[in-house]
C-alpha cells in the first residue's frame, strides 16, 4: 500500500523550503543618471541633488565605492582637458569659485580666475590658485546657489556654514545632527573634520562650534543625492580626488548609516603592506546637516546674492611669451628681430645698408 501525504501538508513543506532560500537583495543603483536632468524640479531637495549629480556627470562620474576605493577619475582639477560638458577642468573649478561668490580675491592668482567669463586664456596663476586652494566648500556653495536654497550663506570654508547652522538653527536651511543618529536623505550634507592629530566626533565638534572665539578648523562636506535603506547612501563632493566625485556609504535596513567608517587615531597608514588603511571613506565623520522640510524652508529669507563684480575685459592677446602648450596662442617674435620690409621676400636676407 502506497502512503500519500495530504495535500495541505505538501504545501506547508513547499513554503518551508522557500523560506530557507536566501532572500535576494535589491541591487543598489547610482541615482545620478536619473536625477541630473531634474534641475528645474519644484522640490528644493531634488534640485540640490540634481545640480550635484550633473556636476559629477560632467567630471565623467568618478566614484568611491563602499569599500573606499577611488575609481573612474579621468580628469584633474587644473588640467586643460575638456570635461563632458566641453568646459576645461580648470575653467570649471574657476566657475565654481566665481558663480558661488566665494572667490577669495586677496589670494595669489584668484584675481586672474575672475576673468573666466571674459577670457579662455589658460592663466598659469589661476591654475596655480586652483591647485593650491581647497575648493570643496566653493562647490557646495555653488550647488546651493544654483538650486536657490534659502537660509544658506555660501562660504569658502565648510566650517562657516556648519557653525551658522549650529548657532542659528531657526534662520538656517539646515538642522545639526549626529551622523550616527540621523537618516540621510537627498539635500542633506555629511561632514568630516580634517585634523590629522585629533579625532573630534560630534560632541567635540559641537563644543568647538559653540565656543565664542570662532576657532578655525579644516572640514569637508558631501551632499547626499540618494539613500537606499539596506544598500547605500550616495553623496557628491567637490575636490575629492581632484574632481567632483560620488561617494557610497553603507546604509542599514532602517535607513541609518551602517557602521559608518570612522578614523580612530590608530589606523594604519595607506601602503602596499596595509591596504586597509587606504579606505577613502575612513574619516572623522562628525556632523550631518539635515535639510529642513520644504514648508519650513519657504518661511526663510531668500538666498543671499552678492552684488555683481565688475570684471574688466582683458586685452585681446595676439601672442604670448610664456606660452602654455595647447593654448592655441602663437608665440611672440623675439624683440631683437628686425621687421621684414614690406614687399620683400622673408626667405631672403635684407641687403646691407647702402647697397644699390
Regions found by a protein language model. Give the residues of each.
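Sec/Tat signal peptide C-region and signal peptidase I cleavage site
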Residues: 22-28
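Second-shell loop/turn segments in exported
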Residues: 34-42, 122-131, 170-178, 209-211
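Soluble non-cytosolic domains of exported or imported proteins
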Residues: 39-47, 130-138, 178-181, 216
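...with weaker cross-activation on analogous glycine-rich loops/strands in unrelated enzymes
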Residues: 154-241
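Low-complexity, Gly/Ser/Thr/Pro-rich intrinsically disordered linker/tail segments
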Residues: 242, 246-356
Amino acid at each position: 500500500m502506497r502512503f500519500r501525504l495530504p495535500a495541505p501538508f505538501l504545501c506547508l513543506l513547499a513554503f518551508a523550503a522557500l523560506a530557507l532560500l536566501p532572500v535576494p537583495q535589491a541591487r543598489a543603483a547610482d541615482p545620478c543618471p536619473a536625477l541630473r536632468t531634474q534641475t528645474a524640479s519644484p522640490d528644493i531637495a531634488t534640485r540640490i541633488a540634481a545640480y550635484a549629480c550633473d556636476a559629477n556627470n560632467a567630471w565623467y562620474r568618478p566614484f568611491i565605492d563602499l569599500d573606499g576605493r577611488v575609481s573612474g577619475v579621468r580628469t584633474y582639477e587644473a588640467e586643460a582637458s575638456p570635461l563632458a560638458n566641453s568646459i576645461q577642468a580648470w575653467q570649471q573649478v574657476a566657475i565654481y569659485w566665481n558663480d558661488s561668490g566665494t572667490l577669495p580675491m586677496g589670494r595669489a592668482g584668484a584675481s586672474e580666475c575672475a576673468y573666466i567669463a571674459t577670457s579662455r586664456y589658460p592663466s598659469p596663476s589661476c591654475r596655480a590658485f586652483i591647485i593650491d586652494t581647497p575648493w570643496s566648500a566653493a562647490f557646495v556653495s555653488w550647488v546651493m546657489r544654483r538650486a536657490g536654497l534659502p537660509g544658506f550663506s555660501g562660504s569658502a570654508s565648510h566650517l562657516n556654514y556648519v557653525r551658522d547652522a549650529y548657532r542659528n538653527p531657526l534662520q538656517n536651511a539646515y538642522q545639526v545632527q549626529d551622523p550616527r543618529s540621523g537618516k540621510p536623505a537627498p539635500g542633506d550634507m555629511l561632514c568630516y573634520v580634517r585634523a590629522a592629530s585629533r579625532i573630534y566626533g560630534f560632541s567635540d565638534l559641537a563644543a568647538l562650534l559653540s565656543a565664542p572665539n570662532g576657532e578655525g578648523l579644516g572640514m569637508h562636506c558631501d551632499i547626499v543625492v540618494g539613500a537606499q535603506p539596506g544598500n547605500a547612501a550616495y553623496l557628491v563632493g567637490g575636490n575629492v580626488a581632484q574632481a567632483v566625485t560620488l561617494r557610497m556609504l553603507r546604509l542599514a535596513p532602517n535607513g541609518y548609516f551602517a557602521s559608518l567608517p570612522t578614523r580612530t587615531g590608530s589606523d594604519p597608514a595607506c601602503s602596499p603592506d596595509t591596504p586597509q588603511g587606504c579606505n577613502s571613506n575612513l574619516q572623522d565623520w562628525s556632523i550631518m546637516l539635515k535639510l529642513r522640510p520644504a514648508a519650513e524652508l519657504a518661511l526663510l529669507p531668500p538666498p543671499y546674492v552678492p552684488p555683481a563684480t565688475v570684471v574688466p575685459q582683458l586685452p585681446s592677446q595676439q601672442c604670448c611669451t610664456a606660452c602654455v602648450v595647447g593654448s592655441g596662442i602663437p608665440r611672440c617674435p623675439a624683440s631683437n628681430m628686425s621687421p621684414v620690409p614690406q614687399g620683400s621676400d622673408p626667405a631672403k636676407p635684407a641687403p646691407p645698408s647702402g647697397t644699390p
